[in-house]
């Protein structure tokens, strides 16, 4: 398959697994691909789930809702029931998307929401045990950030445990599934280091991106690394992402800009010219 020119982000949740009453059938899940047939879309950027937890048959990560018996919202419970039900019957959701897309000549780039914060146990039912059990790995762990700082409960990438946990989920996906590339959504909540440690953090993040890129290319030479970032190069630099260094070293194959946000905010009028 040739390098795609039109790539479509499929959330996998709101337009798919949230919409069907359990038990979801394989044919229903395949609608994630079928609804794009007849369109010029060449590659599907398919979201792996919440990011802290996922909606496929992972062995190194955590399945969405595996740690829950009570749910504050029907939709979140439905996602767990549908994903776990498909997996129990031998239908891995991510593999189904890959196989269906390839059947019709479309590429698949799984999308990992790399970063987001953590809420309370009672309400944040999509969160992983890893997050709940390791608050010391969060950016605000020292307790010295202003009240309301948006990245205080996000993971601090200065910690090797954080980088390893994120990387292992990516590596498993590259190893286990017939994907054509991988997307890091780094603009979902773009906070990766304590504000006082951004300068040191840039090199840490560049080293980690290099590790991901190498793993991807070793798993398949033609596989591409796509990275979604805030559209401001300066804004990225200020939160620890040295985009110019990544590009100079050839660590990124596809660069996707969005409005600086947390979580996502789409603005079709934003100036993307700095990325060109």
Roles of regions detected by a PLM:
Residues 2-27, 67-99, 103-104, 110-172, ...:
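Active-site-adjacent "subsite" loops/lids of carbohydrate-active enzymes
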Residues 33-34, 94-98, 243, 269-273:
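Short amphipathic alpha-helical segments and helix-helix/interface helices
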Residues 19-20, 55-60, 113, 119-125, ...:
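Short, solvent-exposed loop/turn and secondary-structure capping segments
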Residues 3-9, 43-45, 105-111, 152, ...:
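Structural preference for beta-strand elements that scaffold enzyme active sites
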Residues 41-87, 191-195, 257, 266-272:
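Aromatic-lined carbohydrate-binding/catalytic grooves of carbohydrate-active enzymes
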Residues 161-276:
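Active-site neighborhood of glycoside hydrolase catalytic domains
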């Amino acid at each position: 398959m040739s390098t795609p020119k039109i790539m479509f982000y499929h959330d996998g949740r709101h337009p798919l697994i949230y919409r069907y009453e359990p038990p979801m059938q394989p044919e229903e899940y395949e609608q994630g691909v079928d609804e794009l047939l007849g369109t010029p879309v060449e590659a599907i950027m398919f979201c792996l789930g919440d990011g802290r937890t996922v909606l496929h048959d992972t062995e190194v990560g955590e399945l969405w809702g595996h740690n829950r018996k009570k749910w504050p919202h029907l939709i979140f419970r439905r996602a767990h029931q549908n994903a776990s039900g498909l997996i129990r019957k031998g239908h891995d959701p991510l593999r189904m998307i890959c196989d269906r897309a390839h059947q019709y000549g479309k590429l698949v780039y799984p999308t990992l929401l790399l970063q987001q914060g953590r809420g309370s146990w009672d309400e944040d039912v999509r969160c992983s045990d890893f997050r709940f059990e390791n608050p010391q790995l969060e950016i605000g762990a020292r307790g010295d950030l202003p009240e309301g700082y948006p990245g205080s409960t996000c993971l601090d990438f200065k910690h090797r445990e954080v980088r390893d946990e994120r990387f292992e989920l990516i590596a498993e996906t590259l190893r286990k599934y017939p994907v054509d590339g991988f997307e890091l959504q780094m603009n979902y909540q773009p906070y990766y280091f304590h504000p006082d440690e951004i300068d040191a953090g840039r090199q840490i993040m560049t080293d980690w991106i290099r590790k991901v890129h190498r793993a991807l290319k070793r798993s398949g030479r033609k596989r591409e690394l796509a990275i979604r970032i805030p559209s401001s190069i300066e804004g990225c630099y200020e939160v620890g992402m040295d985009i110019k260094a990544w590009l100079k070293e050839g660590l990124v194959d596809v660069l996707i800009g969005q409005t600086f946000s947390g979580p996502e905010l789409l603005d079709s009028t934003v100036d993307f010219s700095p990325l060109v």
